[in-house]
Amino acid sequence: VSYIDDLLRAYARFVSIPWDSSVAGPQRVWMAVYPPEQERRLRLRIGEFANATRQAGHGWHLVDLTDSFGSWLGAHEYRAAYFESPEDLKLALEQFAEELAAHVRTQLTAEHVNESSVVALMGLASLFGVARVSHLIQAVNNDIRGRLLAFFPGELEGTNYRLLGARDGWNYLAVPITASEG
């Protein structure tokens, strides 16, 4: 049995439990925590997470953020200057974070997303060093209708999440889903 098998089993249990509609936005966030080296296996099996969601009677909407920074930078007016002087990019990263939050917010509030939907965020590792996952999730908290599932390649220590094992961690009200619960 693999780590992803156990994570999938734990997720299937979580998604099938009746949802409390009175919880606040931060408590509507589920963090599926897994070791970063399991990323490829998770991506190969993402359809099984979608199936588990649908079998539990909920909608599934996947938002892959993997290419978001590259796409944003490629379309940026000053992209050539940033490649020449990468330190200048630091000032523009706040704009990227705001645009990323707006993109996720649009997905969370799309017409086809309702109180019984799971919106899953994938590709969070690609944000490392350019945007903080904690800030992204906090920026969209109030827009979560059903549940926001964040596939989180990192660690959970108590109630602190650490992206890729680095100190981008934060103490958060999100509900953790780990393979040890499978």
Report the location of each language-model feature.
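N-terminal, charge-rich interaction modules
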Residues: 2-77
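Glycine-rich, aromatic-bearing surface loops/beta-hairpins
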Residues: 132-182
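Residue-level preference for the first positions of well-ordered beta-strands
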Residues: 28-31, 118, 147-149
